[in-house]
Amino acid sequence: MKEIRAYVQPHKLSQITMALMEIPGFPGMSIVDCEGFGRERTEHVQDYKPFLARKRLEIFAPDELVEVIFETIMRTARSGHHGDGKVYIIEAHEGGRISSGERDKDLG
């Protein structure tokens, strides 16, 4: 199991969500509002604030779905401009379902 964590432009969220929901067996996701900056920084003359609004997607998926989810996000979130975002794949060693108490090393 892996976590796919993506930082995307807020205006792309609905398009990304619709594309991900078309993937058979898509496990769902969490969305978090966040701010940040990367190599390309904006400079505001007044009230300097380098942080830009982003949406963070957190998806825990079985290994067999990771590549299709990753590629779907990369394709759908891309506008071709700086600041489109980043996608990471992170190893998730173990998880648990609170409602059932189920604990598994490959919990989907």
Q: Predicted regions: what is each one?
A:
Residues 1-108:
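Positively charged, small/polar-rich N-terminal and surface patches that mediate targeting and assembly
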